[in-house]
Amino acid sequence: RNFPVGLEDTSTYPNLISFFEENKIKIEKSNMSFSVSVAGTNIEYCGKGIGGIFSNKINILNINFIKIFFEIIKFYKKSSTISVENMKNETLGSFLEKENLSKYFVNFHIIPMVAAIWSMPPDEAKQMPLNFFINFFKNHGLFKLKNRPQWFTVSNRSKTYVDKIISQISGEHYKNYPIKKIIRNKENIKVYYGSENEFFIYDKVVLATHADEALSIIENPTKDEINILKNFKYKKNFDVIHSDN
């Protein structure tokens, strides 16, 4: 089954949208929302209206909780006007401290949002370069309190454009071949697959996979390949797939 895990808006991803239009790949409106639920506390809310903010009714009487949303307005308005040209060495965490923002806002809003978008632990979220954070939020309209961009996803999901690309390839194509290793020599490149030590022979090979996977299948990688590919960090991530009525 295909799940819509990729979302995009038309202004931020013009090349991707052009690709969809050129290949007559249909997209449909989707919803990208943000919610927080902190285990062991009464903190629970989402960004959709008063009912979403006070999804846990007990927080109607929680002054610290209510202050979060006033700080959101203040922080978003200020951040949307900040020039980050001279802030290359500043982190998000240090900026939040300078702004004297409450722990409720930091721990229950902005850090969870950053951690969710980039799939990172809260401590690492605070170490994010401020200029990267500001530019990303500006480009994606996330500082806007109103009129945020409409998000879209591919109709029938990624299989649609994968099949479209494959149909346009003039040569042979093979799917579901587990690549074991790639060996280069002066004459050609051998791509080994499966359990029987079978291989394809090519003049050139392009690896369109994650850096750690690429490094693991390249036989005798060069020093440059090792130095570049080993610096990409990965972590296991836990996702919850759900549907709402």
Tell what function each PLM region has.
Residues R1:
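Glycine-rich FAD pyrophosphate-binding loop
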Residues F20, L96, V114, I165, ...:
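A residue-level signal for conserved active-site and pocket-lining positions in enzyme catalytic cores
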Residues F133-Y193:
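Helical element adjacent to the flavin cofactor pocket in flavoenzyme catalytic cores
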Residues L7-N135:
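Mobile amphipathic helical/loop "lid" adjacent to a hydrophobic cofactor/ligand pocket
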Residues V38-T41, K186, S195:
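Short acidic-glycine loop/turn motifs at beta-strand connectors
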Residues L16-I17, V162, A214-L215:
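Short, well-ordered alpha-helical microsegments
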Residues P178, R184, V191-N245:
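Central helical "cap/lid" subdomain
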